[in-house]
Amino acid sequence: MTNNARFGRIREFKVDTFQTMLIDELIPYVDANFRTMAKQSHRAMAGLSMGGMETKTITLNKPDVFAYYGLLSGGTYAPADIKDKSKVKLIFLSCGSKERPDGVKNAVIALKEAGFNAVSYVSENTAHEFLTWRRSLRELAPLLFQ
């Protein structure tokens, strides 16, 4: 996938091409060729950094496809972002302690108050880096498909 968004112009980023490929091509291919549980309730999407931004956009655009959402240093969800909370089984938000952990923690508080199953994780002494994301994945994985 190519995208011509330049540094500092993130608002110009378009996820449409990736979303179409993922939803209309990749997921149907995987479901047709591998032993999967091809239902929304058995599907998760998570991403780190820019992949988190893509994850947020796609999960909000396609709520009938995914039930578990994970943003690893990829922003937050607000309760008003999600139109039908009955479709969402888990929202996992994480970041490094040297990023902006208060945003993640406050978002999870708001999501919980709105009735969502939401979890935050802050990786101590890390920033926007792979150690943060490895630790975050370690925390997220056991929460999926429960």
Locate the predicted segments by residue:
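Non-catalytic cap/lid and distal C-terminal segments of serine-dependent acyl enzymes
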Residues: 1-146
